[in-house]
């Protein structure tokens, strides 16, 4: 079993309030539901224009986990283009 975490940092320049930020994150999380991954906001909860998402995937092979999380990163950029400032992939098992 392979477990991996994708850490994605976002900068949301058009967010003027936490409500605006939450709308963007909800849109992203809803679109990621089709990938069968767990998604949570892990940092910057009280900052309007920044967000960090932790996305976890589990599979039997490292190649499948890596491909799945690469697809997730592509989907985030497709849903909200230009907002991703940094991504980091970490294997836990």
Give, region by region, the residue ranges found by the protein language model.
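Amphipathic alpha-helical assembly/interaction segments
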Residues: 11, 33, 37-41, 53
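Short glycine-/aliphatic-rich beta-strand segments at the starts of folded cytosolic domains
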Residues: 3-14
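Short beta-strand elements
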Residues: 36-43, 83-89
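C-terminal structural segments of small proteins and small subunits
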Residues: 57-93
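A generic structural motif
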Residues: 12-16, 59-61
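Short, charge-patterned binding micro-sites
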Residues: 3, 41-61, 92
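C-terminal binding/interaction regions
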Residues: 21
